[in-house]
């Protein structure tokens, strides 16, 4: 039992240490967020994966992605004005 608790604790620590970028994928055509509607989670997931993220979902009105690589371009409020 103690071993199981130790294993779970180690896995949680690794997840905290190895965090990846997350945010809104950048639409390269207009520099805005990639838009979506409710219920289009699979579409956003595919769009996020095409933008080098691990997964994504529709956070209406835009897709939100997790697990971007460090060199991925994501939407930034300070730089992008859409």
Swiss-Prot record:
Beta toxins bind voltage-independently at site-4 of sodium channels (Nav) and shift the voltage of activation toward more negative potentials thereby affecting sodium channel activation and promoting spontaneous and repetitive firing. Has the structural arrangement of an alpha-helix connected to antiparallel beta-sheets by disulfide bonds (CS-alpha/beta). It comes from the Eukaryota. CDD domains: neurotoxins_LC_scorpion. Expressed by the venom gland. Disulfide bonds join 32-82, 36-58, 44-63, 48-65. Residues 21-82 form the LCN-type CS-alpha/beta domain. Residues 1-20 form the signal peptide. This is Toxin Tpa7. Belongs to the long (4 C-C) scorpion toxin superfamily. Sodium channel inhibitor family. Beta subfamily. It holds the Pfam family Toxin_3. It is found in: Secreted. One of its GO terms (cellular component) is extracellular region. GO terms for molecular function: sodium channel inhibitor activity; toxin activity. Keywords: Disulfide bond, Ion channel impairing toxin, Neurotoxin, Secreted, Signal, Toxin, Voltage-gated sodium channel impairing toxin.
